[in-house]
């Protein structure tokens, strides 16, 4: 018989986390994968590690020539979803994949989903002219809770990491766009969920969420509650 309690990845009813548990001093403090390394079009990409999976964000406006090295032995390799028909070529510990357009897929070895690699390919998003909040490449921003107001446009540049949650209440015309990362791990204990929503907009009108990666949030990741005209486009939500 399956042991549901002991098989849980996250403990569903932890004590509330009332303040961010830690402050990141640089993007280098985020844990990196030891199992995978990835290059795209000859450029090495950062592969991050979470307690559930590894992931890499790949941004380009051209075709994607991917080299994925797997540094642990395996017998069976699967690329999912299988409906994409991605057939890699394999040479040693490196697999080669060519994509003519962005795809989001997983690399799984020996049926292991919990140590799979999520490959998240996207087109590059340029900085909007009306940007009011800009998070720049190569930097980490400890926002705690980023509270938006009407007409805010948040741009998260590729390579930027925003540590915290996002909240908007009764706002009009707000957007979060870019190719960077919002990481919510500071708002929950390891192996636990938490009571706080990750990206929470309530009673808002005209909301755009596009391109960025929302990972390791404390609870429900994207919650537009009682909002009108919400567009969620090409996000990576994990």
Task: Outline where the language-model segments fall.
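Extracellular/periplasmic carbohydrate-active domains that bind, remodel
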Residues: 1-238
């Amino acid at each position: 018989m399956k042991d549901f309690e002991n098989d849980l990845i996250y403990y569903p009813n932890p004590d509330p986390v009332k303040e961010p548990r830690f402050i990141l001093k640089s993007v280098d403090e985020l844990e990196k994968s030891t199992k995978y390394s990835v290059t795209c079009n000859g450029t090495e990409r950062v592969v991050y590690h979470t307690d559930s999976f590894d992931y890499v964000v790949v941004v380009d406006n051209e075709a994607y020539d991917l080299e994925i090295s797997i540094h642990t032995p395996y017998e069976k390799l699967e690329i999912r979803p299988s409906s994409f028909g991605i057939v890699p070529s394999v040479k040693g510990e490196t697999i080669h994949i060519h994509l003519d357009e962005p795809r989001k897929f997983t690399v799984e070895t020996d049926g292991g989903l919990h140590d799979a690699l999520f490959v998240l390919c996207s087109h590059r998003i340029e900085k909007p002219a009306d940007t009011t909040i800009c998070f720049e490449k190569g930097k980490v921003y400890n926002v705690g809770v980023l509270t938006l107001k009407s007409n805010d446009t948040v741009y998260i540049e590729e390579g930027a990491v925003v540590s915290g949650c996002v909240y908007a209440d009764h706002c009009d015309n707000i957007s979060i766009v870019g190719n960077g990362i919002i990481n919510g791990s500071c708002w929950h204990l390891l192996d636990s969920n938490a009571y706080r929503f990750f990206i929470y907009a309530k009673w808002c009108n005209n909301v755009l969420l596009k391109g960025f990666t929302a990972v390791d949030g404390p609870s429900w990741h994207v919650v537009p509650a009682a909002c009108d005209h919400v567009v969620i486009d090409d996000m990576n939500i994990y």
